[in-house]
Amino acid sequence: MAQHFRVGRLSQEIQREVNDILLKRVRDPRVKDVTITGVEVSGDLQHATIYYSILSDKASDEKKVQTGLDKATSLIRGELGHRLSIYVTPEIKFERDKSVQYGDHINELLRKLHSTDKF
């Protein structure tokens, strides 16, 4: 039970710190408009998946952002090691958060359904 709370606290702390690191330390223009939406940490605290969203829907922008984040991973992990008070800094992996796109898709479907009901 205590481990579950620790994982949750660590996830929140990693999310807060990675947002700060992206704003203040990473100078890569490819990652300037990235928002960290969530973090999943494994039960053994060895791996963390960091979910992000971007404002653009272009596939080319998504690829550029992913490349920029992959290049900055070692810097971000090093900074996390200095900022977090844990024994081992988790290995981090960035993944695009598709929930925002999915929510937009559902809203569009509901709008279409609502507009067809009026006729």
From Swiss-Prot:
Q: Where in the cell is it found?
A: Cytoplasm
Gene Ontology process terms (BP) = maturation of SSU-rRNA
Q: Does the keyword Cytoplasm apply?
A: yes
Q: Which domain of life is it from?
A: Bacteria
List UniProt keywords, sorted A-Z.
Cytoplasm, Ribosome biogenesis
PANTHER family named among the record's database cross-references: RIBOSOME-BINDING FACTOR A, CHLOROPLASTIC-RELATED
Annotated function: One of several proteins that assist in the late maturation steps of the functional core of the 30S ribosomal subunit. Associates with free 30S ribosomal subunits (but not with 30S subunits that are part of 70S ribosomes or polysomes). Required for efficient processing of 16S rRNA. May interact with the 5'-terminal helix region of 16S rRNA.
Q: Which family does it belong to?
A: Belongs to the RbfA family.
Q: How does it assemble?
A: Monomer. Binds 30S ribosomal subunits, but not 50S ribosomal subunits or 70S ribosomes.
Annotated protein name in UniProt: Ribosome-binding factor A
Q: Please tell me the species this chain comes from.
A: Ligilactobacillus salivarius (strain UCC118) (Lactobacillus salivarius)
State the encoding gene: rbfA
